[in-house]
Amino acid sequence: MARTDPGFVSRIVFLLLPTTPHDKKRPPTGAHSLFWLSIFFNGATFSYMSQPDFQPTLVGPTITVRPISADDWKDLFAAGSDPKIWEVHPVPDRYTEAGFRKFFDGAVDSKMGFAFVDRANGRLIGSSRYYGYEPESGEIEIGWTFLARSHWGGAANREVKGLMLDHAFTFADTVVFWVGEQNWRSQGAMTKIGGRKREGLFTRALSGETPYFIFEITKARYESGGRTLLA
């Protein structure tokens, strides 16, 4: 930046702006925890909006959801190298070392990925990530989720989804889940936690021609009673 006389800077104002989708005068993020820094230089205004924290550590009663790291490879592959986990998944070979390596590296590189830790014994039992945050629509995806079979059928899925939804709704208005057309297991799990299916089937470039259903949970519905489905 060019050097300027101190008198050039008239004032610096830090503003915390709680935004809503209905407030047209405020930034259209649908977020309630974003900070705007407005700097006024002789009438010129420059604004900076901080990014949400996409990789916090979230602690539940029995599971900790923490940022994934490259050091997690061995233990997470041990948890995910079970063919049964992936048998109805759009990528059924993810139990192989090559298949899981692609999944794992994508999670680490995304800077939005998580590992699930069983608090009782410190073991890694699964993974998930946020993806594709859209500030203008206030929408973000939760996906790439798996749990070791030792934690199927209990409260583990509800617990990790609840932790991730609670955090997502500090800055987003809608959370979506892309679920493969043949993945009846995950479709059932989405229904149990209050996900509503959008009409039709969807595809996207990162998944090729694989058809998906999209389930969504809105912040309004979640706060008006949907959270109780995850208790």
Model-derived features with residue positions:
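A short helix-loop-beta-strand connector motif used in the catalytic cores of GNAT acetyltransferases and
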Residues: 105-115
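Conserved beta-strand in the GNAT
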Residues: 115, 123-132, 141
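A short, internal acetyl-CoA/4′-phosphopantetheine-binding micro-motif in the GNAT/acyltransferase core
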Residues: 117, 143-155, 180
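Conserved active-site alpha-helix within GNAT-family acetyltransferase domains
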Residues: 183-199
